[in-house]
Structure formats: structure tokens, C-alpha cells
Amino acid sequence: KVPGNQKKGAEPKVVEFVDVYPTLCEAVGLPVPHHTEGESMMKLMTGEDKSWKDCAIIKWHSGVTYFDRDYGYTQWNDKAGNFQGHMLFLYRNDHLETKNVADAPENKEIVAQLQKEILARRGKDFMKQVPKADKPERKGTQAHKRK
């Protein structure tokens, strides 16, 4: 619940963790920084926004996941882009993701469609690896004491 928001209930929408920060900024009256990736959920929570996103695409190491209210689909590729494996969960029957049905013949068209969705919706730099930042040494650590 957000202070000043009288609307109660839940919205069956896809939200992402990156949406939390801009939402908190807007809720307390701070400007949302321009580099923020997410979208504020304030209009969604107050019922003003009916055009909220219908899916999310997530990258984790070599895996790319598409999910919406109906499906969760993950595909893994090697560094050269070659297919390594995949999994599909049908949320209407398996919301806990216990049965991978990606290779079931009856889901072939669903898998093909979700693969197209991933390609169509991801950004051009989506598959680039983010370089690891050098961590500054903190005073008081063992590394600091060894110098």
C-alpha cells in the first residue's frame, strides 16, 4: 500500500524488480533519474494505467527468459549463439514451474512464437555481457591489513 492511495486490491499484471525504484521515487515525490530502466507502477496501482506491459524479458548469464501471465520460456545459447537448451512452463496448469514441457510436440508452435517474441522485444545490446566493475578495497578488510 502506498500512502494516499485509496485503491485496494491486486492487479494481475507483469511487473519487474526494476519497476520498484521508479515507483518509490514517484511515491515520495522525487524525480525519477533518467538512467532508470524500470517504469513507475503508481498509475497502475491507482487504476489510471490500463496499458501496462504484458510481458518481461530477462537475461541471466547465457539464458534469456520471456514470461507473461500464461507462459514462462527460457532458452540458453552458448557464446557463439548456438542453441543449448530450453524450458517452457504453462502457468495456467503449472504456476510453480514443476514440469518442463518445451519439447512436447503439442507445444512446438508456442515455443516458436515465444522465441520470436524474445527476438522482437529485446534491445540491440541485450546479449552483451556487462563488464565486472573493479571493487574498491574497503578499509578494515584483510586485504587492507596485508599492505
Name each model-derived stretch.
Residues I110-L114:
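Short amphipathic alpha-helical coupling segments at ligand-binding clamshell hinges
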Residues V101-N107:
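Active-site-proximal N-terminal segment of extracellular/periplasmic enzymes that hydrolyze or transfer
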Residues K7-A10, A104:
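Active-site oxyanion-binding pockets that recognize sulfate/phosphate
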Residues Q6, K13, V18-R92, L96, ...:
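C-terminal cap/loop subdomain of S1 sulfatases and analogous C-terminal strand-loop tails that border
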